[in-house]
Amino acid sequence: MATKETLLEELTWRGLLYQRTEGLGAHLAAKTVTAYCGFDPTAASLHIGNLVPTMLLVHVARAGHKAIALVGGGTAMIGDPSGKSEERPLASADEITANAERIHAQLSRLFAAANTSGVTLSNNADWLLKVGAVDFMRDVGKHFSVNYMLAKDSVQSRIETGISYTEFSYLLLQAYDYLQLYKKYGCTLQVGGSDQWGNITAGMELVRRSAGGEAHVLTAPLITTASGKKFGKTEAGAVWLDEEMTSPYQFYQFWINTEDADVGRYLRMFTFLSRAEIEALEAEHATAPHERSAQRRLAEEVTSFIHGTDVAGVAGEVSGVVFDKRRDPAGITDPIYKAIMTWIPGAAYPGAHELDVLALLEDAF
């Protein structure tokens, strides 16, 4: 586990550090720092892409710093243009509120599962829905020139196709978040994905210009697979953390299907295993890649983190039933039968003891 002095070294080794502001290392080593990361509630659940900033916050908290997970109940009313080729439809206020509550609960469970202390959960709707337009333009807008905003990648990429004032002004709202958290919690570090660099640095500038405070930024890389595909996307779509949207079996299978060239990197990024444990798994995998021991451990660790150890064990058992056709059906327990019928498409059978595993495999695959 990293300390305040070794946090950046730990994040670098784990592949979680892409960009950072000058002087951040000394800032982290000198005192207890409060860091925050935003989570967008435009969907009813977090997805596995959100695990990267989540892991960043967990490592920050475990190193002895404080962390804030900020649900964007206010900014989601506007929509972030970063990485979008066209305007997003605006979700209703009721939908965003419901999503924010679900994501708040998910984040609470994740930080508890990671055994972290010093993590605060907040929602920017608490201040963004209360600030007046004139006050916002005077207190925030005056610190940013139009030229500065036009130079941001999220705006530049939309100049030709068009961008509404709503999305154009998004970075000011996110910058205001940083200022509010600086004033309320003494927050001096924002973390996020590298695609958020423009928005995050705007917040850093606002803290410095408006409050005269020290503020820093740290981003993680956007992840692609060794074959060049975007991480977290499957033919069925996103891989969600909510078991009603992506079953624990499907979640487990996503990780166990990791390419050989990616498994070591994912073990470092998405698990809390030590350097020695991961290096041992990599050595074992290099000797016998067909055994897929590293992939199995990756699937077990991440599924346990998201869904709990018991559910992860069942997901592993179901995976074994589905892919090991030599397995004797008589040895399969009732909980595994029940999970198969719940999680496997087409596995609708009259009773657990009447289940024909070979028929199941034919139906499902």
PLM feature spans:
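NTP-dependent nucleotidyl-transfer catalytic core
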Residues: M1-Q196, I200-M204, A211-H216, K229, ...
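Conserved nucleotide- and phosphate/pyrophosphate-binding catalytic cores
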Residues: S210-F365
